[in-house]
Amino acid sequence: MGVMGNFSQERLGMAAGMNAYSQICIDEAVAWAKERKTFGKPLIDNQVIKHKLVDMNRAVRTSRAWTELLSWKVMNGESPIADLAMLKVHASKAMELCAREAMQILGGAGYLRANSGPGKVERIYREVRVNAIGGGSEEIMYDLAARQLGYKS
């Protein structure tokens, strides 16, 4: 496996990790929204909270499905370089959305540093940019995908 093959594995691994972080954000936000009461009702009963949770799920589920598809392709000898570059961007944007919305749902509790409960979201929120840059920045991934897709003069 050459250098480009290593990049493929790295980007797949990063996408899988970002998907896991995104899911943690969803899980923590749901748990908090069910427990937290506002105006005498659980926070999760608010339409806007449900919409945020659905949007978070949409982002992570599409990212997870794409990751599984590309993992299968790579395991079967394909080298979908453009798709892997786009997946890395998609997974980092999904993670960013999930971390941001989880922080919004958690409110002040989201800023607490801890290794369990809502405090996990604070760490993930800080990790978003590292994951977006590591393995090739979003801008580099866009350029790589564009070249692979033949978008040049």
Which stretches of residues belong to each language-model region?
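Alpha-helical interface subdomain recognition
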Residues: G5-S153
